[in-house]
């Protein structure tokens, strides 16, 4: 095998010198981790003498872990590698400049400017210009004619400025995102035992020899071998394609692989491979190989150029891909086949906003193209007819360059019309707004994984929220108990219980709770004890402490490795059971779980003397009516504690139906989880904002109803539904058990609480609401989740929220936004930010479209009437710069206000440009056009100055057209203030001082305009103005604000003839409309540059594993993600990268051509993104009690920065 990537020869030499200090080498461990099942067990036993011996060779203790000695840790990193994957260097500023130069419109402008520059030096022979139609009326103008090169040079200079600004934007965004990425990396931690202490360690610091504590929901950050496990089941579909969960035991299959998910149970493992030496790291190695091959091919063939998509491809090739040395491999397919395969890959589903922006941008671009072509054609026809028909001139050979110069000038005017018309600033505004919002949302405890989720939340019409930890504080406390036939409203003293009962309570809780759940001293004196681990279990452990007992002493007597069998909690069992050996022989099993479910498994109960008596169905009904329901009505979660002894013959532990029955009830406890004090107000805000909040919980229906009432989801006078999962299913399914949308449509509008629900129920509800067409508009649904089984619902939702504190890695990977404080109020803030993004885009659109309409009409009309554009090419480029970069920066960074929550959601189909906005756009366009045309055709008379109309080629700048240009720009500047309000508000200055960026941009633009007019001279076709002329320009500009008040006073309802624009379409239409997908998606293309995105999911993991198995010719095949991140962080942490599409082609071919892998003699199970996108993909998996976490729709297959594995 080749050396691991990222290590130089000298580094390898040093590493080899230290390898002798350990009992096994890096290559030994890599080979060992490639084995599975019985082969691995045999190799561990024969070659190493067991797992304990491997620990000894790695100089680690399976109980105490590593000592944490810095020198020892550094030595391990040197010998076995670090738990990171090295990134490729970032692109330099010059590379970004070169990529910005690939813009097709800029290229056309550059060519035209160069031609103009060259021809400007040409003079007809003999100096007689009159014969060519160019009359030099004075020596002064002849001198000016000699400086005709300035306009061409100025256009080139303007292009350079535009390119530099674009490159700087890309560079600064990438730098910002990289900084943000490195900050978040530090938050990703894993449970590691060092010096006998369980600590949370950043995954990048994990080394070979570490002892890792693994539990339900974890995403494994490294390869390892199981030391001790409790009912451990792993989802290895990301590596093998096998959807069944793999049971891990010491004697059958102890191999644990990075990138796989813990679906059930817990355990400990010794880390044997990290970083690029882990099984997943080896895949990254091959990925690096294919990337280098692609790069070589690209260099040989040269770049195809011209198309905008190529320009964006170049832009997205950011230097954040892996820099990994390839293993020996062969080329899979030739380039032509690659391109065909890539072309067939279905395009991703767009977000609501992206779909609307794409359509609008294409429509505006087409209109601009038509206007620019018309402008050029009319100018050329006007010139030809005037010179060769009306004036009857002949086409003389010596005049050809002069005529060409005129034609080039006309062409430049046409191109500048196109530059102004095409909404290049629109995608930039989206990117700036989203990036700004994402950064600010982090302060509001929203960690955005997928950029489009930010704006989608602004459209949310429904929120399906968990109860525990989201609406409640997730601080569990036992406040009531039913023990020995007595209902204690307060926790009694321990001496009221018989010693046997007290011992069973203490042992049952201490042993039958995960050993990772603990009660620790408060951080501050006088504070509450800290609850670490599962909060329900912490509540029970707190109950033991309240009884003045020590749970840790019991755990010390029965350490985790002595537990005989553990049935871990899952959504099917709704309970947890632990079996231990009794000292006198036989076994004892402790169980705990939901009271209604556990009581059905009990046939005996302890009385107050601690004696066992029978427990009949009548007794059960009495307990439910007199104990459980009163507790639940107070909002308490009821947990039943039970046990069972097994004497005599050892039972078959795998037959759960026989084991988890005939239990003896010890106690029922009522656990309080108080509602967060800020939640009722947050839910009231949601109601005002037109958002329906539904609670989906696994708790008892009475508990759920009580909490929902406290939160404000339900009020006493409401007639809303509060259903249990079983009843919900009976109402929505037919005789065959299939969900009927029509039945579901009758239920969900009134449903507010779904209790005792399974993950399947949650997914069914979310899917049903999203697919429903019963209402006036389609619903946009947000969902919260924290468990591994919440994955399908989180993926199906328009926006999935995972819990940052209580959430599992699987839930986080499936989500779009992570709530770092697990608080419902943070969701409301996300709604506010989402609506603010939508408004920011609308503000920019209102401003930009006004400029578009006016600039294009002025250039077109001026060209038709005066054979010249009143706004020169360089001036138009300056206007374009104001309009695109500066305005997007100013309008896209407005902070949100509470007023955003006082209106109803926009929904999927509401247009981007409302009738009010259309009124503002056209109203201001009318004002500006009247002023500009007045100044163009009467300005010379009004100001008593020389006319600038029909000026000869290369004539000097005139005050007349300078006033036109200056007034035009000042009107845009003041209209930018008007554009801050899009809903007809009167006060356009409200909150303006809170937005420092806006004030800076407006003042900065005004200062630049003064410099351009006064000092710009010939390059900008300007000449200095008098103070009086400046005052008039300023007065007309301020008139925009006054005119804005007039427009806002006109009732929009009375302007029914106005049309809305920027309509969206349903999500299905967007994703299935292949013709629309082939159009240039400007919004998407810009968003894919330097944006924040997290790489998602498992579908690409499977692809890359196929590549590995193809090259190694092994027997297992599947998919793997395209990202170049580490295994742990690509699931649980955001990315701030830019795409490299060409380097992905190799993997895309594998994905698009499973037959290729099949030919290698392997069997393929497809679990890819295409299959995952179907609506009902998860149902069967969940119903079979096996949840396949389906890969999310990839917004962009982006590579990552350096992130830990």
UniProtKB/Swiss-Prot annotation:
UniProt keyword list: ATP-binding, Calcium, Calcium transport, Calmodulin-binding, Cell membrane, Cell projection, Cilium, Flagellum, Ion transport, Magnesium, Membrane, Metal-binding, Methylation, Nucleotide-binding, Phosphoprotein, Translocase, Transmembrane, Transmembrane helix, Transport
Active-site residues per Swiss-Prot or TrEMBL entry: 466
Cytoplasmic side: 1-100, 169-369, 431-844, 894-919, 980-995, 1051-1205
Binding-site positions, Mg(2+): 786, 790
Cellular component terms (Gene Ontology): basolateral plasma membrane; ciliary basal body; glutamatergic synapse; membrane raft; mitochondrion; plasma membrane; presynaptic active zone membrane; sarcolemma
Extracellular compartment spans: 122-147, 391-409, 866-872, 943-956, 1017-1029
CDD domains on file: P-type_ATPase_Ca_PMCA-like
EC number in record: 7.2.2.10
SUPFAM superfamilies (alphabetical): Calcium ATPase, transduction domain A, Calcium ATPase, transmembrane domain M, HAD-like, Metal cation-transporting ATPase, ATP-binding domain N
Keyword Glycosyltransferase: no
Compartment list: Membrane; Cell projection, Cilium, Flagellum membrane
Record-listed Phosphothreonine modification sites: 1103
Topology with respect to the bilayer: Multi-pass membrane protein
Disordered: region residues: 294-318
Catalytic activity: Ca(2+)(in) + ATP + H2O = Ca(2+)(out) + ADP + phosphate + H(+)
Deletion consequences: Male mice lacking Atp2b4 are infertile with severe reduction of sperm motility.
Tissues of expression: Specifically expressed by sperm in testis (at protein level).
Keyword match Nucleus: no
Molecular function via GO: ATP binding; ATP hydrolysis activity; calmodulin binding; metal ion binding; nitric-oxide synthase binding; nitric-oxide synthase inhibitor activity; P-type calcium transporter activity; PDZ domain binding
Region (Calmodulin-binding subdomain A): 1087-1104
InterPro entries linked: ATP_Ca_trans_C (IPR022141), ATPase_P-typ_cation-transptr_C (IPR006068), ATPase_P-typ_cation-transptr_N (IPR004014), ATPase_P-typ_cyto_dom_N (IPR023299), ATPase_P-typ_P_site (IPR018303), ATPase_P-typ_TM_dom_sf (IPR023298), ATPase_P-typ_transduc_dom_A_sf (IPR008250), HAD-like_sf (IPR036412)
Role this protein plays: Calcium/calmodulin-regulated and magnesium-dependent enzyme that catalyzes the hydrolysis of ATP coupled with the transport of calcium out of the cell. By regulating sperm cell calcium homeostasis, may play a role in sperm motility.
Family: Belongs to the cation transport ATPase (P-type) (TC 3.A.3) family. Type IIB subfamily.
Protein name from the UniProt record: Plasma membrane calcium-transporting ATPase 4
Species name: Mus musculus (Mouse)
Lineage: Eukaryota, Metazoa, Chordata, Craniata, Vertebrata
């Amino acid at each position: 095998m080749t050396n691991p990537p990222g290590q130089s020869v000298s580094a390898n030499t040093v590493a080899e010198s230290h390898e002798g200090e350990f009992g096994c080498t890096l290559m030994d461990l890599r080979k060992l981790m490639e084995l599975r099942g019985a082969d691995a067990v045999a190799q561990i036993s024969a070659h190493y003498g067991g797992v304990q011996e491997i620990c000894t060779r790695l100089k680690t203790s399976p109980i105490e872990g590593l000592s944490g000695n810095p020198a020892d840790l550094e030595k391990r990193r040197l010998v076995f590698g670090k738990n990171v994957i090295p990134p490729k260097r970032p692109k330099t500023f010059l590379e970004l400049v070169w990529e910005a130069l690939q813009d097709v419109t800029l290229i056309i402008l550059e060519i035209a400017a160069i031609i103009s520059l060259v021809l400007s030096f040409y003079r007809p022979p003999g100096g007689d210009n009159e014969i060519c139609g160019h009359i030099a009326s004075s020596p002064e103008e002849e001198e000016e004619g000699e400086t005709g090169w300035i306009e061409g040079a100025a256009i080139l200079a303007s292009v350079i400025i535009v390119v530099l600004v674009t490159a700087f934007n890309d560079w600064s965004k990438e730098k910002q995102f990289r900084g943000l990425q490195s900050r978040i990396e530090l938050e990703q931690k894993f449970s590691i035992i060092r010096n006998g202490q369980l600590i949370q360690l950043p995954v990048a610091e994990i080394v070979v020899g570490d002892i890792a504590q693994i539990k339900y929901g974890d995403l494994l950050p490294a390869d390892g071998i199981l030391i001790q496990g409790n009912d451990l089941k792993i989802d290895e579909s990301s590596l093998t394609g096998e959807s069944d969960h793999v049971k891990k035991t010491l004697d059958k299959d102890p191999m644990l692989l990075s990138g796989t998910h813990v679906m059930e149970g817990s355990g400990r493992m010794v880390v044997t491979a990290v970083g690029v030496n882990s099984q997943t790291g080896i895949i990254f190695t091959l990925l690096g190989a294919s990337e280098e091959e692609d790069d070589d091919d690209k260099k040989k063939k040269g770049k195809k150029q011209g198309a905008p998509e190529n320009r964006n491809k170049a832009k997205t090739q950011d230097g954040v891909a892996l820099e990994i040395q390839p293993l020996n491999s062969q080329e899979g397919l030739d380039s032509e086949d690659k391109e065909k395969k890539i072309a067939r890959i279905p395009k991703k589903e767009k977000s609501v906003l992206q779909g609307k922006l794409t359509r609008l941008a294409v429509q505006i671009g087409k209109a601009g193209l038509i206007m620019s072509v018309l402008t050029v054609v009319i100018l050329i026809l006007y010139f030809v007819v005037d010179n060769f028909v009306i004036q009857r001139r002949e086409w003389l050979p010596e005049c050809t360059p002069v005529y060409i110069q005129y034609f080039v000038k006309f062409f430049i005017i046409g191109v500048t019309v196109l530059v102004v018309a095409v909404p290049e600033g629109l995608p930039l505004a989206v990117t700036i707004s989203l990036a700004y919002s994402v950064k600010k949302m982090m302060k509001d405890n929203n960690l955005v994984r997928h950029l489009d989720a930010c704006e989608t939340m602004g459209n949310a019409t429904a929120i399906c929220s968990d109860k525990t930890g989201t609406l409640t504080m997730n601080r569990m406390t036992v406040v009531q108990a039913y023990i020995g036939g007595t209902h204690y409203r307060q926790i009694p003293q321990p001496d009221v219980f018989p010693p046997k009962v007290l011992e069973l309570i203490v042992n049952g809780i201490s042993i039958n709770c995960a050993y990772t759940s603990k009660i620790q001293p408060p951080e501050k004196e006088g504070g509450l004890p800290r609850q670490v681990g599962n909060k329900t279990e912490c509540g029970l452990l707190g109950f033991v402490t309240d009884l003045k007992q020590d749970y840790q002493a019991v755990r010390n007597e029965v350490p985790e490795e002595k537990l005989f069998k553990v049935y871990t909690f899952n959504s099917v069992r709704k309970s947890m059971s632990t079996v231990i050996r009794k000292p006198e022989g036989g076994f004892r099993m402790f169980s705990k779980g939901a009271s209604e479910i556990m009581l059905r498994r009990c046939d005996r109960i302890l009385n107050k003397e601690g004696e066992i008596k029978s427990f009949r169905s009548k007794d059960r009904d009495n307990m439910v009516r007199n104990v459980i329901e009163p507790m639940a009505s107070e909002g308490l979660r009821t947990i039943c504690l039970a046990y069972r002894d097994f004497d005599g013959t050892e039972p078959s532990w795998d037959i759960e139906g026989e084991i988890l029955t005939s239990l003896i009830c010890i106690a029922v406890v009522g656990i309080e989880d108080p509602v967060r004090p800020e939640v009722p107000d947050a839910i009231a805000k949601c109601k005002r904002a037109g958002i329906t909040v539904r609670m989906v919980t696994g708790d008892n229906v009475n508990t759920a109803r009580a909490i929902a009432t406290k939160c404000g989801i339900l009020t006493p006078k409401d007639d809303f539904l509060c259903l249990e999962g079983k009843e919900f299913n009976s109402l929505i399914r037919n005789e065959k058990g299939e969900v009927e949308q029509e039945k579901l449509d009758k239920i969900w509008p009134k449903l507010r609480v779904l209790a005792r629900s399974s993950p399947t129920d949650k997914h069914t509800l979310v899917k049903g609401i999203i697919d429903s067409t019963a209402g006036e508009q389609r619903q946009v649904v947000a969902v919260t989740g924290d468990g591994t089984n919440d994955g399908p619902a989180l993926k199906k939702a328009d926006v999935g929220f995972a819990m940052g504190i209580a959430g599992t890695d699987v839930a986080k990977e499936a989500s779009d936004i992570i709530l770092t404080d697990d608080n419902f109020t943070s969701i409301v803030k996300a709604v506010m930010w989402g609506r603010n993004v939508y408004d920011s885009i609308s503000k920019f659109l209102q401003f930009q479209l006004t400029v578009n309409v006016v600039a294009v009409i002025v250039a077109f009309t001026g060209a038709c009437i005066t054979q010249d554009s009143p706004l020169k090419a360089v001036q138009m480029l300056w206007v374009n710069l104001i309009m695109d970069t500066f305005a997007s920066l100013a309008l896209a960074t407005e902070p949100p206000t509470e007023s955003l929550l006082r209106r109803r959601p926009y929904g999927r189909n509401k247009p981007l440009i409302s009738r009010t906005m259309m009124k503002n756009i056209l109203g201001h366009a009318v004002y500006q056009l009247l002023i500009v045309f007045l100044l163009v055709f009467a300005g010379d008379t009004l100001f008593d100055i020389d006319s600038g109309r029909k000026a000869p080629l290369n004539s000097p700048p005139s005050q007349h057209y300078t006033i036109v240009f200056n007034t035009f720009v000042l009107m845009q500047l003041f209209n930018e203030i008007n554009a801050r309000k899009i809903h007809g508000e009167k006060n356009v200055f409200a909150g303006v001082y809170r937005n420092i960026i806006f004030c800076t941009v407006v003042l900065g633009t005004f200062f630049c305009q003064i410099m351009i007019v006064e000092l710009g001279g010939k390059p900008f076709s300007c000449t200095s103005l008098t103070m009086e002329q400046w005052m008039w320009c300023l007065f007309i500009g301020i008139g925009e604000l006054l005119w804005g008040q007039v427009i806002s006073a006109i009732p929009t309802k009375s302007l029914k003839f106005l049309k809305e624009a920027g309509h969206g379409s349903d999500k299905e239409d967007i994703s299935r409309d292949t013709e629309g997908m082939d159009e240039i998606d400007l919004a998407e293309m810009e968003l894919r540059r330097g944006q924040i995105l997290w790489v998602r999911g498992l579908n690409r993991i499977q692809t890359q594993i196929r590549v590995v198995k193809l090259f190694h010719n092994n027997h297992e095949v599947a998919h793997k993600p395209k990202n170049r991140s580490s295994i742990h962080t690509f699931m649980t942490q955001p990315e701030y990268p830019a795409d490299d599409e060409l380097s992905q082609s190799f993997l895309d071919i594998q994905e698009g051509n499973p037959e290729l892998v099949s030919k290698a003699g392997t069997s393929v199970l497809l679990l890819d993104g295409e299959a995952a996108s179907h609506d009902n993909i998860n149902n069967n998996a969940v119903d079979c009690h096996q949840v396949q976490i389906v890969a999310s729709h990839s917004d962009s297959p982006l590579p990552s920065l350096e992130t830990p594995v």
